[in-house]
């Protein structure tokens, strides 16, 4: 099959439009009935979501990414599972011109734990320009869905539990630079989703 690309320059180009846990959810969980801490709680939800995605290696809510590679391998693994869709694959040809690979010329595996892309049957990746970095760009959408309900309940519960823990111990927390230890309940909830490289 040839080589597999598992590393490259990954950039999130379109961020999620919602959080996996709503403000009303976390306020109910923490028994908060005022609005004084709303902005602070939203920051904690973001921090807890980032912790979940870092721990598991997964993307919770739909986001768009670009992965840049120095050439076409036999197969391209797309990080931040689950893979939702591949938007486009572009490359710099041997003449230095940007081109787009036809969707008919590659196949997408979004059923595997880590999404993959490879040439369609009896098709080949095109030649790229030598001596130039980042000649291939794969644009794709990752995440369980566009709504919180599409995210597995264990992941959402862990986000809620961690945000609540941070709120209850706010004197030790600086949003954006959280040093708090991940609670065991979060580890237990998230561990089945943790990506493990073999």
Give, region by region, the residue ranges found by the protein language model.
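Divalent metal-cofactor coordination and adjacent catalytic microenvironments
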Residues: 1-198
């Amino acid at each position: 099959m040839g080589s597999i690309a598992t590393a490259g320059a990954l950039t999130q180009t379109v961020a999620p439009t919602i959080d996996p846990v709503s403000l009303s959810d976390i306020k109910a969980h923490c028994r908060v009935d005022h609005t004084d801490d709303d902005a602070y709680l939203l920051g904690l939800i973001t921090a807890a979501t980032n912790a979940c995605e870092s721990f598991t290696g997964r993307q919770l809510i739909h986001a768009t990414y670009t992965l840049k590679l120095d050439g076409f391998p036999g197969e391209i693994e797309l990080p931040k599972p689950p893979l939702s869709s591949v938007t486009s694959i572009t490359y710099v040809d041997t003449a230095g011109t940007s081109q787009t690979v036809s969707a008919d010329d590659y196949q997408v595996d979004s059923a595997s734990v880590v999404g993959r892309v490879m040439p369609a049957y009896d098709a080949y990746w095109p030649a790229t320009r030598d001596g130039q970095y980042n000649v291939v760009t794969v644009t794709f959408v990752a995440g369980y869905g566009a709504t919180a309900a599409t995210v597995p309940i264990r992941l959402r519960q862990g986000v809620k539990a961690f945000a609540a823990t941070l709120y209850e111990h706010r004197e030790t927390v600086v949003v954006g630079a959280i040093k708090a230890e991940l609670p065991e309940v979060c580890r237990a909830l998230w561990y089945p989703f943790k990506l493990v490289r073999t």
